[in-house]
Amino acid sequence: MAPTQSQSKATTQWSLTRLAQQVRPHPTLLLLIRSNPMGPHSAWSWLLPLVQSNPMSLRQYATALQSFVLLLGTTGCPRELFLDLYRFIPTLTRTLLTSLGCGPGGAVVLRSGYRSLVLACSLGASLLLSYHQGLIPRPSGTQACCLTLSLMLASLSQFLS
């Protein structure tokens, strides 16, 4: 019996909430982002080499993204950071986009394009959960959440096209 839409939604929300509870931002990662010599507006591109050379687990993605979210909460201009991300993610998606491949024995292999989409969706989930938990100030959080939802839709449409 296939799960209903409400069951699927509840399961997804439970999974994201559980992931958010397990993730503890690594202080060293946050320090590296803050002291990035390229400046805070390059914080997103700082993640690109990690994605390309060292595929991370979903939990590692979430830890990195949670740290980015906390960084957004400490700056006065989340809009600028999110607009920078808005420009960066489509490049990441185009660069890493690959189709589903066929592995040994005919198994479906999810390649790096899938990880790019997970990155964008994890960002959205991390941001929204952090906003809900009060980790991001309300005025900047509302605007950032709207930009992130737009970003997730843009990334999804690019991934599917």
Curated annotation (Swiss-Prot):
Protein origin, superkingdom: Viruses
Could you tell me which InterPro entries the record lists for this protein? Sapovirus_VP3
The family database entries (Pfam families) matched by this protein are listed as:
DUF1478
Q: Which family does it belong to?
A: Belongs to the sapovirus VP3 family.
Q: What is this protein called?
A: Uncharacterized protein VP3
Could you tell me which species this protein originates from? Answer: Sapporo virus (strain Human/United Kingdom/Manchester/1993)
